[in-house]
């Protein structure tokens, strides 16, 4: 069994028209054993910027803490909020530093540029190789199922409500086909003037 699927989990981000959405499941388990149903996998990195971490739960928390430390230093030094592209470079550096004994987590970044409000999504592998796309990115144990659902449902230029509906359906249907993720979904829809966070109920088995 892969160490990446030891705790399970799924994270997804999707781009809309002047908005982005990021979603994650809520399960934390040890293989088939369930531990909790409210595990945090999405962390705020700015006013309109989030990172989702799927993989080994200990590394999820470690990477989130180390990233927050680097982010605070950056904001103190620069005196401004970090741009999504810069955060991607910061995460890539953090992961690549540990390439010979990596953090077992595959991050997903979603947010809007603090000045231009341009939507941005990307994913990285466990040694920090980034992939920036214009549609959607996925990470976690049921990535094949998530890719299938996203390919079917995603459309360009979706408004925030349509984007929420699409990412929710894709996420709920994908985690239903995976034994080690699920137990509810949390969705953040990021717009220029507001962030909407919703928690969805899913199958609890």
Curated annotation (Swiss-Prot):
Q: Which UniProt keywords apply?
A: Acetylation, Cytoplasm, Nucleus, Proteasome
Report whether Zinc shows up as a keyword of the record: no
Cell compartment(s), UniProt: Cytoplasm; Nucleus
Point out residues bearing the modification N-acetylserine: 2
Q: In which tissues is it expressed?
A: Detected in liver (at protein level).
- State the InterPro entries in the record: Ntn_hydrolases_N, Proteasome_beta_3, Proteasome_bsu_CS, Proteasome_sua/b, Proteasome_suB-type
PANTHER family named in the record: METALLOPROTEASE TLDD, PROTEASOME SUBUNIT BETA TYPE-3
The protein in question is named: Proteasome subunit beta type-3
Organism of this sequence: Mus musculus (Mouse)
Taxonomic classification: Eukaryota, Metazoa, Chordata, Craniata, Vertebrata
């Amino acid at each position: 069994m892969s160490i990446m699927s030891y705790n399970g989990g799924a994270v997804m981000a999707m781009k809309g028209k002047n908005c982005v959405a990021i979603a994650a499941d809520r399960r934390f388990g040890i293989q088939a054993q369930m531990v909790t149903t409210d595990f945090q996998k999405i962390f705020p990195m700015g006013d309109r910027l989030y990172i989702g971490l799927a993989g080994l739960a200990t590394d999820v928390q470690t990477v989130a803490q180390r990233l927050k430390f680097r982010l605070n230093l950056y904001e103190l030094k620069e005196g401004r909020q970090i741009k999504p592209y810069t955060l991607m470079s910061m995460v890539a550096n953090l992961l690549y530093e540990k390439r010979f004994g990596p953090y077992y987590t595959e991050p997903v970044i979603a947010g809007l540029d603090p000045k231009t409000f341009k939507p941005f999504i990307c994913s990285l592998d466990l040694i920090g190789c980034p992939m920036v796309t214009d549609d959607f990115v996925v990470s976690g144990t049921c990535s094949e199922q998530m890719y299938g659902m996203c390919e079917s449902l995603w459309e360009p230029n979706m408004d925030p409500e349509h984007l929420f509906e699409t990412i929710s359906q894709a996420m709920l249907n994908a985690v239903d086909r995976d034994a080690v993720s699920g137990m509810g979904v949390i969705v953040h829809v990021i717009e220029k003037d507001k962030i909407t966070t919703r928690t969805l109920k899913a199958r609890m088995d």
